[in-house]
């Protein structure tokens, strides 16, 4: 019989909370998953909460990753939704998406929030910093990637990191849109910020297949299709608790996100 283990740290609040929700949802499908803080793989299928703590488990393969959501600006979107994928995350994950519901995108993004693409031909090349390389192997470290951007492009500015929770969503939007007024292109390695900037009409240069919006390279006219797809890649805690997500992801099928 297939064994399942949810790798979560009891010392990390969101992991401890979500692990119980996952366990309850799987039980409704007759799947008995144990919760463990073991840093090694202990089951046939591993369920990993986040990409930072469980890299040894990840390296053994056959795992499902629960990671940061792609869409939504409100506190509930941030704290009660996660993207779920097989054997990778962001652009490298397999999200098993089928039967698109065009209305799902509206749960996270209003029509009026999706802005027309901006054309600032002489504008700023916006460098979007991130914690590390993700799973990119093209650079030795994240600073080497930054150096690459500075050497290759002119008029580079670093994106300011502003949290909507600190200033409120509407004030945050105003500040972000003000910063983006003179941006020609945003340069992103593989951060979920690419989805946010795509919504705000910024041309995104994806420098790694791990970027959630890598599939838009040369196909910006497919923006709405990609955003709708991303809405199907993330799940609300209620959908995880009732086991709805498992109906879609119990079988590892479909392309990686960067291949769609």
Where are these regions (language model features)?
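Short loop/turn segments at strand-loop or loop-helix junctions that form parts
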Residues: 5-9, 66-71, 122-134, 159-162, ...
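Flexible, charged surface loops at secondary-structure boundaries
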Residues: 1, 38-46, 56-60, 117-122, ...
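Leloir-type glycosyltransferase catalytic cores
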Residues: 79-122, 136, 214-260
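Extended catalytic core of nucleotide-activated donor transferases of GT-like folds
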Residues: 29-79
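N-terminal pre-catalytic "stem/leader" segment of glycosyltransferase-like enzymes
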Residues: 1-49, 133-134, 247, 252-260
């Amino acid at each position: 019989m297939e064994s399942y283990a949810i790798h979560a740290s009891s010392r990390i609040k969101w992991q401890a909370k979500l692990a119980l929700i996952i366990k309850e949802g799987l039980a409704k499908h007759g799947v008995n998953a144990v919760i463990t803080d073991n840093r090694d793989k202990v089951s046939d299928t591993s369920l990993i909460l986040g990409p930072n703590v469980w890299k040894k488990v990840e390296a053994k393969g056959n795992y499902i990753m629960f990671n940061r959501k792609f869409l939504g600006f409100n506190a509930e979107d941030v704290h009660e939704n996660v993207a779920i994928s097989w054997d990778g995350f962001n652009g490298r994950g397999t999200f098993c998406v089928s039967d698109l519901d065009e209305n799902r995108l509206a749960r996270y993004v209003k029509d009026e929030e999706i802005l027309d693409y901006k054309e600032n031909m002489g504008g700023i090349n916006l460098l979007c910093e991130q914690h590390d390389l993700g799973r990119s192997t093209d650079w030795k470290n994240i600073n080497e990637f930054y150096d690459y951007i500075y050497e290759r492009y002119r008029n580079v500015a670093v994106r300011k990191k502003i949290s909507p929770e600190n200033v409120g969503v509407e004030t945050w939007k105003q500040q972000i849109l003000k910063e983006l007024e003179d941006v020609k292109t945003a340069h992103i390695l593989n951060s979920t910020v690419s989805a946010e900037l795509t919504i705000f009409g910024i041309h995104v240069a994806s420098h790694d297949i791990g970027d959630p919006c890598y599939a838009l390279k040369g196909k910006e006219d497919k923006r709405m299709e990609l955003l709708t797809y991303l809405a199907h890649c993330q799940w609300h805690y209620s959908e995880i608790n009732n086991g709805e997500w498992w109906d879609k992801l119990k079988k590892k099928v479909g392309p990686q996100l960067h291949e769609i």
